[in-house]
Amino acid sequence: MNKFFFIVSGLFFLNSCGVKKVTNTDFSNSLKKPTEIINSVNSNSNYSKWLSLKGRAKIVQKNQEITVNVNIINRQDSIIWVSAKGPFGIEIIRSQITPDSVFLINRINKKHFTKSVLEARELLKVDFSFYDLQDIITANPKILKKNYTLKSNREFFHLIADSVSYLVTNTYKVQNIKRLTNKNTLEITLEEYLKEDNFPRKINLKVEAGESFEATIEYSKVEFKKPKKILFEIPNLYNEEN
């Protein structure tokens, strides 16, 4: 497992919380402005203090493909914690992100990774913060304020700018995000929202940054507002990944 795969796998697992209110939209008026869409999406966010997710993740990089079971815990504005387990429930990676630091434990190679968020972002060549990641995990992605071209139909709004685009549903949920930074591309898709909690059961991430990387998580269990015990301890015998 190379360094890129080690870092990106952990970051994605790190790679959602509140229940969003569904808004009925009248598409008979096609003269929507980009600012209206942006304000509707960004004001529609609703966070829960705690979010717990369980599911399966498929990760593809180059010719490698792995499928793991994942547990994700998000404590709002504080910690994103993830455990990824392989066959027979054996843990492969445990990771933790705070607003300023990234920690990963690789059980297979008996190594750990500790970097500032800024250092990790530079290594990955992706402009993504703790809060951006939290917004994706909690299904509350924000739309950056830029000059957009707007295309729409009865189901979607499509906001397009030079370096970013958003596909927004008629209930003001962001379904797809594409970002381009220094020829590196990041694409995120949130799908299969359930009516009872208005939360996506499937998230797909694609990264093109010298090497291609794709990960898809399908959630089987979603819990809101239930506090969880978070454990993260680096074994003394593990070496640090530089």
Predicted region positions:
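Short beta-strand segments
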Residues: 66-68, 91-93, 113, 184-188, ...
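C-terminal low-complexity, charged extensions that often adopt amphipathic alpha-helices
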Residues: 123-152
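Gly/Pro-enriched, hydrophobic low-complexity segments
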Residues: 20, 146-242
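Start-of-domain marker
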Residues: 21-100
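An acidic-aromatic
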Residues: 80-130
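C-terminal motif of bacterial Sec signal peptides marking the signal peptidase cleavage site
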Residues: 13-16
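Positively charged n-region of N-terminal signal peptides that target proteins for export
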Residues: 1-4
